Swiss-Prot record:
InterPro entries: Ribosomal_bS16, Ribosomal_bS16_CS, Ribosomal_bS16_dom_sf
UniProt keywords, alphabetically: Chloroplast, Plastid, Ribonucleoprotein, Ribosomal protein
The family this protein is said to belong to: Belongs to the bacterial ribosomal protein bS16 family.
Organism of derivation: Galdieria sulphuraria
The encoding gene: rps16
Name listed for the protein in its UniProt record: Small ribosomal subunit protein bS16c
Cellular compartments annotated: Plastid, Chloroplast
Single Gene Ontology BP annotation: mitochondrial translation
């Protein structure tokens, strides 16, 4: 099953996150199928590729709770 979830990146104590599509059994920092955007919680910077996100949602990918909340704020879902 595909999941749209956050993948941690960045330096220690200066984290940022990539929004990626992964198999639900893969590790958090495992290999992603595709990168859909990024989020930096420190600077509140976000980028979401809406076309790719909608494509994977139509294919049946389930967003995690955090990603679901991000998509709700961006009015994608």
């Amino acid at each position: 099953m595909l999941k749209i979830r956050l993948k941690r990146c960045g330096r220690k104590k200066q984290t940022s996150f990539k929004i990626v599509v992964m198999n639900n059994l893969d590790k958090r920092d495992g290999q992603a199928i595709e990168e859909l955007g990024f989020m930096n919680p420190r600077t509140k910077e976000k980028y979401l590729n809406i076309n790719k996100i909608n494509h994977y949602l139509r294919l049946g990918a389930k967003p995690t709770k955090t990603v679901f909340d991000l998509l709700n704020k961006a009015k994608i879902i």
